[in-house]
Amino acid sequence: MKKYESLDGLRAYAAIGIVMMHVLANIIVKPSSNYLTETIIPYFTNFTLLFMIISAFSVCCGYYERIKNGQIRPNDFYKKRYKRLLPFFGLMVIISVIMDHNYSALCEGFANLTLCFNLLPNPNISIVGVGWFIGTVFTFYMLFPFFTFLLDNKKRGFFVLFISLIFCYIAITYFSTSDFVVKKIDRVNIIYSAPFFICGGLIYLYKDKIYDFVSRNYYLTLTICILLTVVKFIFNKIDLFIIPDLIVFSFWLMYAIGSHDKILNNKFVSYISKISLEIYLCHMMFYRVIEKCHLENIIDNNNLLYISTFLATIIGAIVFSHIIKFIVFPRTIDKLLK
């Protein structure tokens, strides 16, 4: 199976961007107001949508043909999904439950550990708040055999994308009211997120042609991606539904499929990509630790305070993720198997 190494860059930069966004959103003493802090960094919250497209493409690379041709058992597929998501997420849930130690935390923690908590009506779980993404992605995994059916061929895939966009729009504009739901329908809901997963699957169906085109037209594809991103921010205040994000992130994924540039292909992003999910899940825990250190009493410059808080948060998350994923878990598994 061909390895698309530039996807590592997208995962790494998306994870870092989400940390930047969360630190900016939560820090009490804000940095200087400018286009970067008021528009660019807050937009990084949408990198979770990029993660969805990448996740769908990656899972299709590994399992689309095997599920379509009946070459893998459901037991094997879902065991690997649990093995990938549950250990680190479960650890974060247990830590959060211990810290909160109340009945609500226990109930929410139990729901989290099933990974099926997005089957709840309007889940609004505070234990590992960023864990909503795990629930949405695992719902996609549960539906993946059906997803494979929907993308059985390219023609059906585009039809399904069109239908999913209509359903998403109706869900947001009609069903997202107190008559139908308690909580507004957003990316936590699989109907809202479905077009992003479907786009990832459609890109998979065209992956060979995309790879050949991007490889031959590297600068043209990069220019198109940059222009689309710039246009997205120029018309950022115009409500065009989820279409702009869908287009921009899809084009960046297509660029990454055939790209071999050093920005998306280097040792740093390759390493960060391996722990990108873990960084995403644990970074807010480290932000809360840094917050209690009250760096604002030491650093007078607001911009330097934000940068220092971000660096301390991301470094803490990287170190913790590395130790748990590459040292603690392997040794624990080895002992259990002996």
What are these regions (language model features)?
Residues 162-166, 215-229:
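Signature aromatic-anchored transmembrane alpha helix within multi-pass, membrane-resident enzymes
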Residues 45-48, 129-137, 186-201, 242:
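Membrane-interface micro-motifs in multi-pass membrane enzymes
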Residues 142-144, 200-210:
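Internal transmembrane alpha-helix with an interfacial aromatic "cap," most often the third helix
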Residues 1-174, 181, 263, 275-276, ...:
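Membrane-cytosol interface segments of multi-pass membrane proteins
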